[in-house]
Amino acid sequence: MSRSSQKTVGLGICGLGRAFTLMLPTFVGDNRFVLVAATTPNRETRDIFNKDFDAPSYPDLTALCTDPNVDAVYIASPHEFHFEHVEIAARAGKHILVEKPLAISLKEAQAIVDIVRDCGVHLIVGPSHSFDAPVLQARQMIASNEFGGLGMIQAMYYTDFLYRPRRPEELDTSRGGGVVFSQAAHQVDIIRLLGGGLIKSVRAHTGNWDEARSTEGAYNAQLAFEGG
């Protein structure tokens, strides 16, 4: 694929599943990006990418990261592989956009922070609802102090997430499955924006009540901010 004279970010895609299809309109609609390569284990899917985008595809991320046209990598692989794939991209000197969750353990998340700092690359985690217009408007109203100081945020959210068609790993907590990894990141992202600070403590409970889909299907959490 030829790169235009306009400065663009050559984006390599790691994972061509649902997350990628949701992000695709954004990528192709923004002339600051060009899709230059992809990787997925499925050969047939790689062939479709080659045809649709006139760009190469690779059987693994290590091979993709050798492509000189790749400036940054969008990681949309299953949750359990995020740590491995972030490390590969970072050590290859590629900037990274990774879908939430960042990792499936605190240890992995901290290791990712250390790795990207050591490698001198930028990393962004993918929750996006804090950019929704109503959320941004609410943040503006809070920041204006027109209605007084913020005392408490109550957020309630319900979907049929657990009962949609799911791959096996999406129903296995040890592999990053369940609503905490897949859904809670959105609510925490929004609440942190509205609260305008860092969280100092978390108290939480989870519910795992369906033996047929034995992962967390519900949760509640109380988050306390440093500023009170």
PLM regions with names:
Residues 13, 59, 98, 123-125, ...:
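Hydrophobic residues in well-ordered beta-strands that form the structural core
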